[in-house]
Amino acid sequence: MEEFKGYLQKGGFKQQHFLYPLLFQEYIYGLAHDQGLNVNASTFNEPPEISGYGNKYSSLLVKRLIIRIYQQNSFLYSVNNSKQNRFVGHNKNYYYKMICEGFSIVVEIPFSLRLVSSIKETKEIMKFQNLRSIHSLFPFLEDKFSHLNSVSDIVIPYPIHLEILLQILQCWIQDVPTLHLLRLIFYDYHNRSNSITPNKSSYGFSKDNPRLYRFLYNSYVVECESIFYFLRKSSSYLRSTSFRPLLERTHFYGKMKHIGVTCCNDFQKTLWLFKDPFMHYVRYQGKCIIASKGTHLLMKKWKSYFVNLWQCHFHFWSQPSRIHINQFPHFSFYFLGYLSSVPINLSSAKSQMLENAFLIDTFTPKFETMISIIPMIGSLAKAKFCNLSGNPISKPAWAELSDSDIIDRFGRIYRNLSHYYSGSSKKQSLYRIKYILRLSCARTLARKHKSTVRAFLQRLGSEFFEEFFMEEEKVLSLILPRTYYPLHQLSREPIWYLDIIRINDLVNHFDL
């Protein structure tokens, strides 16, 4: 990043927001590939003197490539001409991918510089490093959701129109050539994809260029949430929490009180104006959760607000029927691998007044998180640890490894799952996962030694797996003093860790 800043200041590009010249810097593509590129100039049909020393990557090759991108229909040659032009075929996909990877590095520079400058301006953000953890969100839900009435689980609509994305980026990137090149890349890939598969989405390049896709998606989400931030900042009722520390909250936007919401379309027509006395907004992956203590009518207004926001501001048609308003405690929702709900717990207390005794029933809502075992078994079956019925099977791909490596892999998977699901209110499903992985490990070892599982376990003993499948509460009992928590109580209470910054692949059941 310091090298980026030095180049921008040296060339005078920082003040004018010129990013286009960075596309011709070799270190940009070295960063994109995390190594030096060895691109042969003959693949470009260029003479050796253009490629530079040692046939290494040259900025002149990128310049020639960008010129070809600007040429009309440069990627849409017929099959008959593909033999005469080496730019067509498998090479064109490589060229396109190379430009996109370098381009994704370049367009992130304004955002990265702004984040670095904001961190230097204040040290307040350093106090919230623990909020990087995914588990840091669950204590907030435990504290707040038990007092709320309504919740709505919304899928953020995507993709939006390409021109809307470009309009969003114009607020951040003021370099016209860079935006023009991005537009050409969008439509060029769109045309090439539709010429092969007409029904393919225009954002099919998410698999080919995940970094550029994530950048575009995050830009769109930031635009959505910046509207909430603007309303929150402009409201006279909101004077409590600053927005700057919330930059560190990867999956948490913040609490909003008494928000006066106004949404205007192109005709400056006010759609809604209302105040919510207690509203919470949480975003995770491709979804967001809106929870409120208000009435059902107020939630319907929020629903209409989101629909009008997507239709008027982003020109994206969103069906109102896809946004469901649910009432606690009769609703459970999937959240970061957990099945979350707010059931009503009944507790009775005996009260005695003089000679009369009374039983007082107290209904207390409590936020609970459980492991959804059916999707979890589906993930384990997809990874070839069991079948769809949950019966453990061997892992033939690991049968060539040593015994210690096989056991270490299975044990590491279970420890990671146990670590992630430590916040579950009920541990029975976690024991089921442990059973599947232990027996799958035994079947894999028995397959390797051409023996049965019973004979293998009798020869080594069941204690052979204990050190590799150590329980989470046993680990905590070694760390915490004995007087800090009783072991039986520790196994029942949810435990949230502040070192989990990504979702386990087996936990992420759904393609969002």
Curated annotation (Swiss-Prot):
Principal localisation: plastid
Classification via InterPro entries: Domain_X, Maturase_MatK, Maturase_MatK_N
Superkingdom, natural source: Eukaryota
GO CC annotations on file: chloroplast
Alphabetical keyword list: Chloroplast, mRNA processing, Plastid, RNA-binding, tRNA processing
Subcellular location: Plastid, Chloroplast
GO molecular function, one term: RNA binding
UniProt entry tagged with the keyword tRNA processing: yes
Biological process, per Gene Ontology: mRNA processing; RNA splicing; tRNA processing
Function: Usually encoded in the trnK tRNA gene intron. Probably assists in splicing its own and other chloroplast group II introns.
The family this protein is said to belong to: Belongs to the intron maturase 2 family. MatK subfamily.
Protein name listed in UniProt: Maturase K
Species of origin: Lemna gibba
Gene: matK
